[in-house]
Amino acid sequence: MNAIKFLTQNEAIVMDQLLMGKKYAFSTDSLMELAGLSCASVIQHVYPTISKKVLTICGPGNNGGDGLVASRHLVQFGYDVNIYYPKRTDKELYHNLVTQCKHEGIEFLESMPTNDQLNNDYGLVIDSIFGYSFKGDIRSPFDTIIKDSLNNIKTPIASIDMPSGWDVENGNIKNLFTPDLLISLAAPKLGSKSFKGKHYLGGRFLPKEFLKETNLTIPKFNGSNQFVDITNYQN
């Protein structure tokens, strides 16, 4: 496997800005669509048969948007998905994503399921609360969701880009939950080096010239795959 560069928080922010600048001309919605599709593809690969429902917990930013897109694609793949999206934004992009999900028949929950419900009624919980831009304290209602629910349930958890609440560069310094599956997007973040579960890289959208300009090294994607397994990668 080719070498992999783990990004600092600032590197991830700068690269995202470059990707969406005039030179490379990507838009937020196009990147979100590709990221969400890759997340759904990883989940279908790792959990091909889930007899129970899937719950996606969405945060207010782009990571939550990735979760909305992934949920829509999972329904297309045959999964039964619920979404809990407690803190929404007024931006049109997110309104559109919610509308698209509703037209797929996805139910948006009014309240967070209890831990018993999560353990008994759901076969997978998707954590799309916070991504690479997270820093500082975990605020309501996500502090309760993470500390009271995700920290204590037995249902498998799949985190998008970073496990929510982890320090992007230093990892799980707050002793929070560890997901069963982590789907890093574009390139893994420095804080995920300590992650010991199933680890996949998604977000297959970086142009060759972009990789050269940024000296970013990522593994090769095979064929038309939207992801690559980096679980056994050793630095």
From Swiss-Prot:
Binds 1 potassium ion per subunit. It is an enzyme of class 5 (isomerase). This is NAD(P)H-hydrate epimerase. Its cofactor is K(+). Catalyzes the epimerization of the S- and R-forms of NAD(P)HX, a damaged form of NAD(P)H that is a result of enzymatic or heat-dependent hydration. This is a prerequisite for the S-specific NAD(P)H-hydrate dehydratase to allow the repair of both epimers of NAD(P)HX. (6S)-NADPHX binds at N62, N63, G64, G65, D66, G131, Y132, S133, F134, K135, G136, D137, D161. It catalyses: (6R)-NADHX = (6S)-NADHX; (6R)-NADPHX = (6S)-NADPHX. It comes from the Eukaryota.
